Swiss-Prot record:
Residues 25-38, 81-92, 144-150, 197-216 are cytoplasmic. The lineage of its organism: Bacteria, Pseudomonadati, Pseudomonadota, Gammaproteobacteria, Enterobacterales. Residues 1-3, 114-122, 172-175 are periplasmic. It comes from the Bacteria. The keyword Zinc-finger does not apply. It comes from Escherichia coli (strain K12). It is found in: Cell inner membrane. PANTHER family: HYDROGENASE-4 COMPONENT E (PTHR38601:SF1). This is Hydrogenase-4 component E. Keywords: Cell inner membrane, Cell membrane, Membrane, Oxidoreductase, Transmembrane, Transmembrane helix. GO terms for biological process: anaerobic electron transport chain; anaerobic respiration; formate oxidation; glucose catabolic process. GO terms for molecular function: oxidoreductase activity. The keyword Oxidoreductase applies. The gene is hyfE. Possible component of hydrogenase 4. Its EC number is 1.-.-.-.
């Protein structure tokens, strides 16, 4: 198996884990699947670094391991503490429909990325299609889920997808760019988690349908 095939397969595994993040009922399981997905992303960065002798991506992989594999799951686990796991959740789409939509999104993205010239290798276009699809799947999660914590997970999925797109298209970007992206993502998750916890303590619900009357 060539290096490009390994990267493409790992990218496909990222899409699969994202469906588990969205679909499982337990918040802690979602955190676990997100950590696994982020570990796959770190593996992709490390593989690309070895294939193309890109020291920047090795630094990216170390940064992503600290922020995405360790910090974000810990923050999301904190957000879910003391929140019952058996609260009925409403969503526009069930797990089966989300899987079908994910497949359609990746198929559409495969056509979109055809004209794109990758600076690394043309054999990585499937990974680029999955990365773009991963971003859109995170956006779909935000739109379709009615639970605030699920929407935060959707943001995290979007961030992972955009991170992989950046690695494939602009992998020579300075390390400061990667540090800035990771820092922004961490602070965004922290702010959203604090707001979600405040809403839960005040109103006893995380369903956005019940929060339409909130005033600033």
């Amino acid at each position: 198996m060539t290096g490009s095939m390994i990267v493409n397969n790992l990218a496909g595994l990222m899409m699969l884990t994202s469906l588990f993040v969205i679909s499982v009922k337990s918040y802690r399981l979602s955190c676990g699947f997100y950590a696994c997905q982020s570990l796959v992303l770190v593996s992709i960065f490390a593989t690309l670094s070895c294939l193309f002798a890109a020291e920047q991506l090795l630094i990216w992989s170390a940064s992503a391991f600290i922020t995405k594999v360790l910090l974000v799951p810990l923050i999301m686990t904190y957000a879910a503490r003391n929140i019952p796991q058996n609260i009925p959740e409403k969503a526009l789409f069930g797990p089966a429909m989300m899987a079908l939509l994910a497949a359609l999104i990746v198929l559409l993205c495969a056509f979109v990325v055809q004209p794109v010239k990758l600076p690394m290798a043309t054999g990585l276009k499937p990974a680029l299609a999955v990365a773009l699809g991963h971003f859109l799947l995170g956006l779909l999660c935000i739109v379709s889920q009615r639970n605030i914590l699920r929407q935060i997970f959707g943001y995290c999925l979007m961030e992972n997808g955009s991170h992989l797109v950046l690695a494939l298209l602009a992998w020579r970007a300075p390390e400061l760019v990667e540090i800035g992206i990771a820092t922004d993502a961490i602070f965004a998750v922290i702010v959203m988690v604090l707001l979600a916890r405040k809403i839960w303590r005040t109103h006893g619900t995380l369903d956005v349908n019940n929060l339409t009357a909130l005033k600033g």
